[in-house]
């Protein structure tokens, strides 16, 4: 039998790696060059005049003072302890920052026309928008040197506007605590309980109640603002050029907010549109541009609740922790409400409904004392400015940033003996400690940048707290948490988690 011889097996040649070695070496070298160039870019810092304060050692390679974002108060204290002059420099990514302390530096920080308040926000990491350029609503020169934002903020807090909104403010606030009475647990987080009405009233005052009354748009907006207030972005401050998921998320949120406000503004600006007596109508009647109106409203509803969402809840926690002050405030509420009541025998909440604006603003001295002390202890932050002057041979060079930490003032033993203890009586007339230094209290801003929303913030708190105390007696669950006055998180402002008990007042 003939057999066909099989084909000889193929000869497998060994793979010659030498063929690929040059390409592999070239690729690895290219990656290494790119990596080294990137690290060199991160490490590069420009030179400065010798007047600049010495740099703190509390930094991290390549990115600089990351603790400024992560543990800001620890970073401040550690850098000050190291400093021989009470000042220090540090890098936030590529941004040069000067930390200041002392009375003279504080006065310069507050009064200098070259230190820009809006520009300082670039190192906070909380904005929805890319850092530069400064939005037009914040640029000076709109009216007597003021920005569009400041001018309209002031307009919307005029007496006529507040009187117009007052019935809605009081009815909403009362409604919050009427609803809370249905909770069988008798325990709540006051900050969470008040957050809805605080934000709703900010939207009503600075835009229109049409948004608040929209059953779909308002809950979504409330949730979005709540998330945004608790966030601060490390990469936005240290690596602003780096595309991140967080940055894209912020851009989507900004776009969504515009989708809420733009249709309302467009509808109201049409010829023959139904008029409403609100702040949106005020801007339309003034002939303000559409883009300025939309940017103002978005900025206002983000900025306005930043502190009020914290302080309103904390004020109730304070009332719960200090029964004597709660009862003083309650007695003042009862006396004032009765003096304006149509029926002095009606429930206290009904009596409050009849009070005029001037009574709401000036009739609660104990609440005012407690609020000022609360602001002292809780507004413990790093204030930030940017030098927008053209001179580079300065202590704070042109383009650099300056920060001042308010804990130096608000927790000064000289100005506030026993500063970590809540003592509203320290603000009674005749107590001159706080007058010992220039700007001994900066809770409402000072100098060239006083808080433009102070009137509204105090009125809003008075209304909310008055109805809360009229309906309930508050008791502290944890009598220590109210003393916590600083955060070691980022620059965001998450809601406090403290709980308080509430029980109906017998007289109601």
Swiss-Prot record:
A single BP term in Gene Ontology: sterol metabolic process
Keywords: Glycoprotein, Heme, Iron, Membrane, Metal-binding, Monooxygenase, Oxidoreductase, Transmembrane, Transmembrane helix
Positions of region (Disordered): 481-508
Membrane topology: Single-pass membrane protein
Assigned EC number: 1.14.13.-
Pathway stated in the Swiss-Prot or TrEMBL entry: Secondary metabolite biosynthesis
Enzyme's top EC category: oxidoreductase
Cofactor: heme
Function: Cytochrome P450 monooxygenase; part of the gene cluster that mediates the biosynthesis of the dimeric xanthones cryptosporioptides. The pathway begins with the synthesis of atrochrysone thioester by the polyketide synthase dmx-nrPKS. The atrochrysone carboxyl ACP thioesterase dmxR1 then breaks the thioester bond and releases the atrochrysone carboxylic acid from dmx-nrPKS. Atrochrysone carboxylic acid is decarboxylated by the decarboxylase dmxR15, and oxidized by the anthrone oxygenase dmxR16 to yield emodin. Emodin is then reduced to emodin hydroquinone by the oxidoreductase dmxR7.
Protein name: Cytochrome P450 monooxygenase dmxR5
Organism: Cryptosporiopsis sp. (strain 8999)
